[in-house]
Amino acid sequence: SDLCQGCLAHPCMEVCPKKAITWESGRSTIDQEKCIKCGRCATVCPYNAIVKTERPCAAACGMGAIHSDELGRAEIDYSKCVSCGQCLVNCPFGAIADKGQIYQLIQGFNRGDRIYALVAPAFINQFPTLASTGKLKAALKALGFCDVVEVAIGADLCTVDEAHDFLEEVPGKLNFMATSCCPAWSMMAKTAFPDLAKNISMTMTPMVFTARMMKQADPEARMCFIGPCAAKKLEASRRT
């Protein structure tokens, strides 16, 4: 950085194993083509002039799924990605976007499809001082939804089902049981801790419970989940 003081010792040049640092115009310059990002130069610089910068998206990713390609652009490794959405909300440039389905929803309204709004429990606090639960439900119906259903119902069904599984499996067959409510968590556990995958409950998520319940009541209707979790989109796209 511009903090380089042009010291006579040049410790950064001495410790670089790839000779990637040269002396130009009175200060040290790093050749990015040779640099292997080992960090030795930053460690020995007495003026803290060498700073390691990290992409906000990569720093936010707990799975290490984001790296730089040969052109220095951020690239997502989908074999590690769990669709948690942290890179999306932490990118200061809006360069990462999830797949929107607003167009398909509008098409459904225009066709006259019966579409239920399945709202996550978090909706109740989205506009705490501006709109009550009743107003939010009325607004969704005014948009074209035939009815509004709270996914909290599915959460209750999920709890009961998981409780039955727990009583049958623990501690006789399993030493513990992990919840399956969060699709991002389930993917992370199966990817990072494959030996513990068997301990994850096979119970459906609250969203799936609610959607199936409504499908049984109204087979011709379509379901639209509304919630803050990006991983739900990946979950909804699966055929299970």
What are these regions (language model features)?
Residues 98-240:
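Iron-sulfur-associated redox domains of electron-transfer enzymes in respiratory
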Residues 20, 49, 65, 95, ...:
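Glycine-centered loop/turn motif at secondary-structure junctions
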Residues 7, 36, 52, 82, ...:
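Residue-level recognition of alpha-helix initiation/capping sites
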Residues 31-32, 37, 47, 56-57, ...:
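Conserved Radical SAM active-site core
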Residues 1-44, 48-60, 64:
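Ferredoxin-type iron-sulfur electron-transfer modules and their immediate structural context
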Residues 16, 25-27, 49, 54, ...:
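Glycine-rich, histidine-containing beta strand-loop boundary motifs that form or position
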Residues 6, 10-15, 44, 90, ...:
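Transmembrane alpha-helical segments of multi-pass membrane transport proteins and ion-pumping complexes
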Residues 11, 40, 56, 86, ...:
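Short Gly/charged-rich anion-binding patches and loops
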